[in-house]
Amino acid sequence: MVLIWLSPLILFLGLILSGRSALIAGTLGTICAALVAYVAGPSHPDAAAIIRHFAAGAWIGLPATLVIIAGLAFSLSLEKASDNADPSQPEHGALAEACLLRGPFLETSTGFGVGYVVAVSGARRLGVDKAPALALATFSQILVPWGALGIGTRISADIAGVSLAALIWRIAVVTALLGAVLLPLFWRLSRQAKLPPALADRLEWAGLIVLLMALLVAANLTLPLELAAIAALAPVMLLRFLRVKGFAGLDWALLARLAPYIALVVALALMRLVPAIHDRLEHPSFKPFADASAFAPLLSPALPLIIIALVVAIRRGGAKQAAALMKLTLQRAGRAALLTFLLVGMAWIMVGSGLAGGIGLSVSGVLGSWSAGIVPVAGALGGYLTGSNTGAGAVSMPLATALVPAGEARLAVIAAAVVAGSLLTAVSPVRVTMGQVLIKATTAETGQALRALWPWFALVVGLTTAIALAAAQLA
């Protein structure tokens, strides 16, 4: 029976492995989940209940979908500004800055692999060959749990039914541990790229990464999800900038390039941290499903993202440019938006119909507390195959709720799974193909990059699985 209950996930992952598009796999996986829930669901839901479960999942996916659309518009509006950034001299510090700071900053604020694109392009401008450039750009995805202002992490928390505030600092701790063990891999790949770090570079970047990870944990303990990673990155980026260019580099041209990002951070801070503004924007709020989160449209990060994107477009080319921007945004975002609805709907059907609970009881009866190790592996597999931490959450969160009892252990296991799924999106076929097309790399060069990244796979999956198992054993 457990294989029947698992069949929606098996079908979804199997279709992707066979080369089908994620949209087709998501559609068929959702249909399969509905049929299995109706025929063999432990809670015996009728058709109306299954439709309600899917609708509740789609409702959870709505805020994320709006951020996907608005974030893509924001990214597209700033493409030319990114292309006109000052070129850097070919040295290790410039490479590390592109891959470890600038790429993660753009990924957290916009998502969609924008940080990866910036990092791989930056590496190529420094004279790095195509294969090592693809491998090094992977490090721009180290903060994907906060990518696109954290929409994937928010969805995972909603599916699992856990407190977002309690989850995000645990995700930050797991990320900090991985940041420490992955930095030597970055140095190794840098040597292969012929931009090796000197001792001074190692000391500087070890210090900067330690500072970044400490700030990341602190920010996630005190700030909302949307602001935490940006707040951690900003002072580290400023410190690096001042060390390289000094205060003389803080000119009006730099301010003009950064203005959209500054406006975004200020808007998010006002919306989330100023009680008078937050309370005013909290209404209207909609909660059509008792077991799904409320949604306040005026508090959505999508609002400042789309407003800033339109302002930038209008300043460049008037209303015509703004209309062209929105047309292009909707063309590119449509598939991602639909896939988000399908994946969250499928996961919610599995949770609401009792499929996830039935799986948990069956597996736990055999493996006991060791079954917790399955969750980050499932997250990693979902992230790798879909290229999306929303997809990773849709695969792993139903298992987390089923296999791990509620409490501290479940939060730790979910944090490990979110990080595993997020960091495996960095080496997913979706992400790597994006870089391959951008820099016109051959299949052989792409394969060389992936072979160089085998420690990334091993460290991410190994450490997150160990954390999940330790949390379950100590509970």
What do the PLM-derived regions correspond to, one by one?
Residues 2-3, 59-63, 86-99, 126-133, ...:
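Membrane-interfacial loop-to-helix junctions in multi-pass transporters
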Residues 132-238, 409-410, 433-467, 475:
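Membrane-core helix-loop-helix motifs of multi-pass transport proteins
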Residues 114-125, 151-162, 390-403, 431-443:
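Re-entrant/interfacial helical elements at transmembrane boundaries that shape
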